[in-house]
Amino acid sequence: MENILDLWNKALQKIETKLSKPSFETWMKSTKAHSLQGDTLTITAPNEFARDWLESRYLHLIADTIYELTGEELSIKFIIPQNQDEVEAMPKSPIKKMSKEDPVDIPQNMLNPKYTFDTFVIGSGNRFAHAASLAVAEAPAKAYNPLFIYGGVGLGKTHLMHAIGHYVIDHNPSAKVVYLSSEKFTNEFINSIRDNKAVDFRNRYRNVDVLLIDDIQFLAGKEQTQEEFFHTFNTLHEESKQIVISSDRPPKEIPTLEDRLRSRFEWGLITDITPPDLETRIAILRKKAKAEGLDIPNEVMLYIANQIDSNIRELEGALIRVVAYSSLINKDINADLAAEALKDIIPSSKPRVITIKDIQRIVGQQFNIRLEDFKAKKRTKSVAYPRQIAMYLSREMTDSSLPKIGEEFGGRDHTTVIHAHEKISKLMVEDEQLQQHVKEIKEQLK
C-alpha cells in the first residue's frame, strides 16, 4: 500500500467532492493520517467535539473512500493527538430523514439569502458556535436539541440560524423550516387569541421540522407567551424536531424566565459567540468587499478593523460608508479618506490622560496662583484653598496614588491629601460656587 500520508491526501480530495464546502472545511480539512496498523487506519481529529462528529457521521464515507482507492476494507479509528484519547469508531444506525408529509411553502423573505455557511467568516470567537450549527444542520434533532446560541448584538447569531435553515432546505427541499423572532411569536400568539385562531397558530409552529427562534430573551415577563412556547417546545422535542434558539445572554441570566423553560433550554448545547479578534475582523471586511465587488486597500481594512472591534454590523457598515464617501467626493480610497469618512462614528483619538500638573495649571488659572505655590509651604487661604481643590481633583481624575499626589504638592503626607479630599467633598455639598468652580475646571481638563 502507498505511503499513508499520500493515501490520506488522495482520500481527502475524493471526500471533498462528496461533501458541501462548509462540511468539508469544518470536519475533514483539519484531520490527519496518524497510523496504519494491520487493517486499522487511525485518523487524528483536532478535538473531542470533532472526533465524536466524525465517528457518528463520516465513518462509512471514509471507509468507502479508502476502499475505492486501495481495494481494501479497513477499520477506521479516531484519536485526539493532544492526549491520545482513542475512541474506536462504531457503525451508527442510519439517521432518520425528516418527515416529508404535508409540505409547507416557506415564505421567500423568511431566510436571508446572504446568510449561509459559505458567507460566514469563522474566527476564534465563533468557531465552536459555527461547528455546532453545522452539526445541527447536517443532522436535525440528532446532534444537539435544542441548540442555544448567545452573544452580543451583531456578532452572527442570526446569520448562523439562517445558515442552518438554508442548509436543511438545500438538502431536503420538502423540509418545513420556520424562522421568526420571539417578538413575532408573541404578536402572532396575541392575535390568535384575539381572533379565536389559537388552533391555527399551534398547528403552524408545532408541525415543523426545524424551528429557529431569534432573541428569545424578549419572552421574559410574558407569562402566557412563555406558557405557549413551553408546549410548542415540548411537542417539537418529543417528535424529534430540531429547535434552535438565540439570545443576548445565557438562559440562566434571562430575567423572569420560567424555570421549566430555562431547564429545557439547557437540555441540548449552549454555545456563545464573542467579539471577533483583529484577524477575523479583517477577514470579515475582505469577504464583504469581495461580495460587493469592491477593491479596498489593505491599509484601509486594517484601519477600520482597528477602530471597530465589537460589532460585525458596524464593521461592515463602516466599510460601506467609506466606499460611499469616496464616491461622493470622487477621491481614491485610502486610510486618510477612511478616517475622514468615519470621523463622526469613530473618536479622532483616545481620551487624553489627565496629569496632576494639568490640574495644577488649570486650578492656578482659575484662582490666579502660580504653579510653584502648590508646592510651597504657604498656608494662607488664598493658596491653601486652591491647593486643596487641586488635591481633590488629582484624587478624582487621575490614577495617581496618595503618596504620589502628596509628592507633587511639595512632598506633603498622604494624610494631607485625604484631608483635602474629604474637606472639598463636604464643602461642595453646601457651596454652589465651589461646585461651579470644580465643574468648570473639569470641563477645561477634558
UniProtKB/Swiss-Prot annotation:
Residues 72-109 are annotated as: Domain II. GO terms for cellular component: cytoplasm; plasma membrane. Transmembrane segments: none annotated. Residues 327-446 are annotated as: Domain IV, binds dsDNA. Residues 1-72 are annotated as: Domain I, interacts with DnaA modulators. PROSITE patterns: DNAA (PS01008). The keyword Translocase does not apply. GO terms for biological process: DNA replication initiation; regulation of DNA replication. Pfam families: Bac_DnaA, Bac_DnaA_C, DnaA_N. Keywords: ATP-binding, Cytoplasm, DNA replication, DNA-binding, Lipid-binding, Nucleotide-binding. It is found in: Cytoplasm. ATP binds at residues 154, 156-158. InterPro entries: AAA+_ATPase, Chromosome_initiator_DnaA, Chromosome_initiator_DnaA-like, Chromosome_initiator_DnaA_CS, DnaA_C, DnaA_dom, DnaA_N_dom, DnaA_N_sf. It comes from the Bacteria. Gene3D superfamilies: 1.10.1750.10, 1.10.8.60, 3.30.300.180, P-loop containing nucleotide triphosphate hydrolases (3.40.50.300). Residues 110-326 are annotated as: Domain III, AAA+ region. Plays an essential role in the initiation and regulation of chromosomal replication. ATP-DnaA binds to the origin of replication (oriC) to initiate formation of the DNA replication initiation complex once per cell cycle. Binds the DnaA box (a 9 base pair repeat at the origin) and separates the double-stranded (ds)DNA. Forms a right-handed helical filament on oriC DNA; dsDNA binds to the exterior of the filament while single-stranded (ss)DNA is stabiized in the filament's interior. PANTHER family: CHROMOSOMAL REPLICATION INITIATOR PROTEIN DNAA. Oligomerizes as a right-handed, spiral filament on DNA at oriC. NCBIfam families: DnaA, PRK14086.1. Belongs to the DnaA family. Domain I is involved in oligomerization and binding regulators, domain II is flexibile and of varying length in different bacteria, domain III forms the AAA+ region, while domain IV binds dsDNA. This is Chromosomal replication initiator protein DnaA.
